[in-house]
């Protein structure tokens, strides 16, 4: 009797506790595509096979399907499917629908073995599910660190190229690429220290991001150099945005240890027609143009916007 009680409590706990701990009621029920239902269908088929074939080994038939579910579904769904499968098997064994007696009368020791076997089987997909969830979470963190600059929280160079592949840019007909360089940034590091320099970069990036908003993409290319890509249908939009950025930076005071600093920025602008299918290549070509114009802005006194179009130079 003690063995029967122990096996019942143990198997019940293994099946129910993970399900209860991960239980969450979604606000909106997710829509499953036909191919996403294949693991669940395989699970149903494997349980039916257990009934048809019988024998003690048939209790493990659903295990491959449960592991498939663990790989494809969330831990919450996996725990629920594991609980339902285990409960169904226990009920089927108890009512001799799945025959594991192999010709001998059904006894408590056999039920003890069946319950422990089902509980052990249930642990495997749950462990796999949480392992997969942990790996996916880690991969997202790695991707986030690769795509965003840690200091400024804007896109990194690689993140910008990934963002240019976004389906939201399919309507792009024109692209303006700006290359921004904070004027005399080295003197800020020399006079106020690198901690101040890092703070300047962070505040500068946040200010640029606020000005650009959802109209463009902001990235730190390295050091004090930033890039802004503005997809549009109007060639003038990008140039107006560049001047808005330059003036916005010039008028924005920066405070460091009770001292007020004013920053200026030199901007080079590359502008031209672009297509979503070749957006990365178009960006690279316009970056070369923007780099040339940035050099001109710095050579001609800094704190200015230079472009090869629309009057050669805007100040």
From Swiss-Prot:
* UniProt protein name: Probable diguanylate cyclase DgcF
According to its UniProt entry, the protein's GO biological process terms are: cell adhesion involved in single-species biofilm formation; negative regulation of bacterial-type flagellum-dependent cell motility; regulation of bacterial-type flagellum-dependent cell motility
User: Where does the UniProt entry say this protein principally localizes?
Assistant: membrane
Per the record, its GO cellular-component terms are: plasma membrane
Please name the GO terms that the record assigns under molecular function: diguanylate cyclase activity; GTP binding; metal ion binding
GGDEF domain span: 173-310
This chain's source organism reads Escherichia coli (strain K12)
* Keywords on record: Cell membrane, GTP-binding, Magnesium, Membrane, Metal-binding, Nucleotide-binding, Transferase, Transmembrane, Transmembrane helix
The encoding gene is dgcF
Return any one Pfam family short name.
GGDEF
């Amino acid at each position: 009797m003690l063995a029967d009680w122990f096996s019942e409590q143990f198997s019940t706990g293994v099946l129910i506790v993970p399900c209860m701990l991960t239980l969450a009621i979604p606000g909106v029920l997710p829509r499953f595509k036909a191919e996403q239902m294949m693991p669940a269908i395989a699970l149903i088929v494997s349980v039916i096979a257990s009934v048809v074939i019988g024998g003690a080994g048939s209790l493990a038939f659903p295990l491959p399907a449960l592991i498939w579910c663990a790989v494809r579904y969330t831990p919450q769904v996996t725990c629920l499917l594991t609980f339902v499968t285990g409960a169904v098997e226990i009920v089927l064994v108890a009512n001799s629908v799945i025959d594991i007696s192999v010709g001998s009368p059904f006894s408590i020791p056999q039920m003890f073995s069946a319950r422990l076997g089902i509980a052990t089987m249930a642990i495997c997909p749950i462990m796999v599910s949480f392992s997969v969830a942990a790996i996916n979470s880690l991969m997202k963190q790695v991707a986030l660190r690769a795509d965003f600059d840690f200091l400024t929280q804007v896109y990194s160079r690689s993140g910008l190229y990934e963002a240019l592949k976004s389906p939201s840019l399919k309507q792009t007909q024109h692209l303006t690429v700006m290359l921004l360089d904070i004027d005399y940034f080295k003197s800020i590091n020399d006079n106020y220290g690198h901690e101040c320099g890092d703070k300047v970069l962070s505040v500068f990036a946040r200010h640029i991001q606020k000005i650009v908003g959802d109209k463009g993409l902001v990235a730190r290319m390295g050091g004090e150099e930033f890039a802004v890509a503005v997809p549009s249908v109007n060639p003038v939009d990008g140039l107006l945005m560049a001047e808005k950025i330059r003036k916005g930076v010039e008028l924005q005071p920066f405070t460091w240890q009770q001292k007020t600093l004013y920053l200026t920025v030199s901007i080079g602008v590359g502008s031209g027609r672009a297509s979503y299918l070749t957006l990365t290549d178009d960006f690279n070509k316009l970056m070369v143009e923007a780099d040339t114009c940035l050099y001109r802005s710095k050579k001609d006194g800094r704190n200015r916007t230079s472009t090869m179009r629309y009057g050669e130079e805007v100040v």
